[in-house]
């Protein structure tokens, strides 16, 4: 089932997400719905807060990039209760980022190129790995959502001031995108 994506201004996007208990109801269906929503919206990553659930769940599908980045062929994974446990700050990189919850806004964000991540897979098996490159960037972006952060929190105050009108338009529902969204209720 395709779910609406919550846009900038929704309170759930600013909440710190809770760990998912092992007996979470219909977790496999939720993961399937998130992947379907991600495909429909033509994104590469989706965090549960973006669909209105304050739980630590992220899905990432980098297979769509396989023509340019063959190392991501068939890379389609859920990350349950993920946490970044270490940042290797010895090398950072600035790259433009966008977000399904911030349609039509793209800004350069500087992030470490290598991180250590712990998570559970779809079978609830634990993993602890160092991740680098583009996947590290995507994970940092998506895992930020689980901590109530968005990429615009990582740009300079000047850049944030320059996109102020775009953010205001999002809050007012004045934007276009090719996927279902959940807006803030209109104030009377």
Indicate where each model-derived feature is located.
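Active-site rim/adjacent substrate-binding subdomains
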Residues: 1-140, 145-188
């Amino acid at each position: 089932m395709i779910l609406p994506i919550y846009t900038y201004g929704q309170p759930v996007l600013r909440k710190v997400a809770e760990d998912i208990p092992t007996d979470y109801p219909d977790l496999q269906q939720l993961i399937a719905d998130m992947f379907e929503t991600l495909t429909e919206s033509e994104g590469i990553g989706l965090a549960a807060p973006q669909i209105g659930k304050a739980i630590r769940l992220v899905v990432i599908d980098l297979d769509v990039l396989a023509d340019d980045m063959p190392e991501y062929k068939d890379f389609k994974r859920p990350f349950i209760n993920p946490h970044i446990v270490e940042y290797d700050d010895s090398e950072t990189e600035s790259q433009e980022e966008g977000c399904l919850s911030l349609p039509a806004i793209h800004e350069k964000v500087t992030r470490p190129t290598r991180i250590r991540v712990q998570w559970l897979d779809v079978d609830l098996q634990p993993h602890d790995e160092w991740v680098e490159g583009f996947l590290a960037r995507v994970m940092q972006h998506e895992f930020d959502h689980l901590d109530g952060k968005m990429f615009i929190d990582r740009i300079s105050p000047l850049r944030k001031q320059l996109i102020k009108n775009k953010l205001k338009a999002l809050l007012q529902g004045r934007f276009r995108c090719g996927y279902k969204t959940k807006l803030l209720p209109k104030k009377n």
